Amino acid sequence: MEQKYSLLSHNTFGIDVSAACFLEYASVDELRGLIGSGRVTSPYLHIGGGSNLLFTKDYEGTILHSRIGGVEVVAETDDDIVVRVGAGVVWDDFVDYCVQRHWYGVENLSLIPGEVGASAVQNIGAYGVEVKDLIVRVETLNIEGKEHVYDVTECGYSYRDSIFKRPENKSVFVTYVSFRLSKREHYTLDYGTIRRELEKYPGVTLDVVRRVIIAIREEKLPDPRVMGNAGSFFMNPIVGREQFEALQAEYPQMPFYEIDTDRVKIPAGWMIDQCGWKGKALGPAAVHDKQALVLVNRGGAKGADVIALSDAVRASVRAKFGIDIHPEVNFI
């Protein structure tokens, strides 16, 4: 247990705040022991890699962080494999582990920051793949020390959302996540950017796809170790068919992705760019010059600086397109 613990290394935005108390654990029994000892005082917050958080001030409570590790094969057939992964495993380390063993499914999620537990909370996704389509079950322990295993059908998954993000489940801590991966060669290569990059290689393999995804992300997204950020700051809005057609008539060059016959997803980054924000700064916070969906800490920014920029960007998009874009990042 550490008092007045700096959270600078526990949030990828690089916001310099502290927690009144910081507790780490490496097993379910350790977590249960911390809970039973009474050291987890309210308010409390469980964090992963801090890649989806924006701290707005010092946290006057207890921060919990998992170091539960391990990747265990729990079921296997000729076609697929189920692995149980500790919530504290770094997400990209897990992706690399799978690629090296020729397990298909997570390669498009390469280089996403954060940890495995948070992947199940956030329903991370990229390049046509969402983690909900790979998850089998999520194991948890609550603040009363009770374990519960959620089947994927109980997790309430939707775009960047799950029941674990609900306020009433704040006291539920993810301990393990089980994933089903394919042993048969299978890729999701629907995005034009991926297909264009793959043309540089003589053939498609898991390792090649991972390298391509990493190259694309590194070109568009800043390294949080160099420039603080939380990746995509805003969610891509989903609009109804009628609103989409009206916008398309006005902006025929607008990119879009069909969700179903009634709903269409519009890239928030494109709208932000159209509003002239790409590369623009507001104090020490800025919109990244290569990917307008990303807000960055140019150095010394506080949470309030990032929120002020976020509010200004949202107001511009609302005024120009009549669409509200919402932060993907959680404000603390």
UniProtKB/Swiss-Prot annotation:
The active site is at residues 160, 232, 328. The keyword Cell division applies. InterPro entries: FAD-bd_PCMH, FAD-bd_PCMH-like_sf, FAD-bd_PCMH_sub1, FAD-bd_PCMH_sub2, MurB, MurB_C, MurB_C_sf, Oxid_FAD_bind_N. Keywords: Cell cycle, Cell division, Cell shape, Cell wall biogenesis/degradation, Cytoplasm, FAD, Flavoprotein, NADP, Oxidoreductase, Peptidoglycan synthesis. Pathway: Cell wall biogenesis; peptidoglycan biosynthesis. It is an enzyme of class 1 (oxidoreductase). Disulfide bonds: none annotated. Its EC number is 1.3.1.98. One of its GO terms (cellular component) is cytosol. Its cofactor is FAD. GO terms for molecular function: FAD binding; UDP-N-acetylmuramate dehydrogenase activity. It is found in: Cytoplasm. One of its GO terms (biological process) is cell wall organization. SUPFAM superfamilies: FAD-binding/transporter-associated domain-like, Uridine diphospho-N-Acetylenolpyruvylglucosamine reductase, MurB, C-terminal domain. It catalyses: UDP-N-acetyl-alpha-D-muramate + NADP(+) = UDP-N-acetyl-3-O-(1-carboxyvinyl)-alpha-D-glucosamine + NADPH + H(+). Signal peptide: none annotated. Residues 15-184 form the FAD-binding PCMH-type domain. Pfam families: FAD_binding_4, MurB_C. Belongs to the MurB family. Cell wall formation. This is UDP-N-acetylenolpyruvoylglucosamine reductase. It comes from Bacteroides fragilis (strain YCH46).
